């Protein structure tokens, strides 16, 4: 029984490692700077959506990594502290970029949500109309 858990952990670690290796290779060949971790997330998401990888194959290690995510951000926090001098020089520019990006992100997210919700409401209305038409056909009321 414990052998299966170890194998499951090792197979999940291998899947994550392979995805990160591929994303690192892709990141080095891209003409624009893109974090390999973001590329890895896109690859993992794509593989899950295409059902190349089943959720069960990566779920327990993903849950474990999510549980220690605060610990994984410690090196990033230390890097930010080491860069405080540079950040102080460009404080206004950095703050402006953060505020503008946040406003744009909120606007795009809101518009996208309205688009999706509006699409769902339209489909619901179309489905109701179709049911009424089909019900009328059953009773011989629609020509």
Curated annotation (Swiss-Prot):
Is-annotated flag, keyword Transferase? no
- Report the record's disulfide bonds: none
Q: Which domain of life is it from?
A: Bacteria
Question: What GO biological process terms does the UniProt entry carry, in alphabetical order?
Answer: cytolysis; killing of cells of another organism; programmed cell death
Q: Which InterPro entries match?
A: Antiholin-like_LrgA (IPR023736), LrgA/CidA (IPR005538)
Major localization listed first in the record, in broad terms: membrane
- What are the alphabetically sorted keywords of the record? Cell membrane, Cytolysis, Membrane, Transmembrane, Transmembrane helix
Bilayer-spanning residue ranges: 7-26, 31-53, 58-80, 90-112
Q: Where in the cell is it found?
A: Cell membrane
**Which GO CC terms are listed, alphabetically?**
plasma membrane
Cell membrane found in the keyword field? yes
What membrane topology does this protein have? Multi-pass membrane protein
PANTHER family hit by this protein: ANTIHOLIN-LIKE PROTEIN LRGA (PTHR33931:SF4), HOLIN-LIKE PROTEIN CIDA-RELATED (PTHR33931)
Q: What does this protein do?
A: Inhibits the expression or activity of extracellular murein hydrolases by interacting, possibly with LrgB, with the holin-like protein CidA. The LrgAB and CidA proteins may affect the proton motive force of the membrane. May be involved in programmed cell death (PCD), possibly triggering PCD in response to antibiotics and environmental stresses.
Q: Member of which family? A: Belongs to the CidA/LrgA family. LrgA subfamily.
Task: State what protein this is by name.
Answer: Antiholin-like protein LrgA
What is the organism field in this record? Bacillus anthracis
